[in-house]
Amino acid sequence: MIGIYAGSFDPPTNGHLWIIGQGARLFTKFFVAIGQNSQKEYCFTLDERLEMLEELCIHFDNVEVVHYENKFLVKFAESVGADYILRGIRNEKDYTYERGMRYVNGNMTDTIQTLFMMSPRYLVEVSSSLIKGLVGSDDWEQVVREYVPDTVYYKMLNKFGGIDLSRARKTALEKI
């Protein structure tokens, strides 16, 4: 079975990484797809997000990081032969939105199903929007560190805090 998990991953969070781990266990082949919308503004470039996710997924042999632009996810999923779209659900709002998207996708194709996965309690409040909203406040670094993998944390410090990325990357890789 082939699965796909998509998002903007701007930036990737511990919640994203948890879902990726679940998908890697559930599917024989699992795509992590970065959706790129030319009308949307991002903190991290597509190349930066690809690099971060590739680093985060390096230990999963069956995971491939890809991207797609200006295309419906279900159509992209069809193009890579996916059987399932995996979606993380943190709360009722996520469920309502994702349920609606599942019905829209079902109208476009009946060959791909959506699988909802409930996030564990400790990840319920984690979102890329929350992370970006914290940057710039006093001591944002300590708070953000709780919600993102080390690779992402050091990229954020480099982008928003002016540290030496090569030193930070070496430190992050030593923890792997």
Regions from the PLM with identified roles:
Residues 1-176:
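Nucleotidyltransferase catalytic core that binds NTPs
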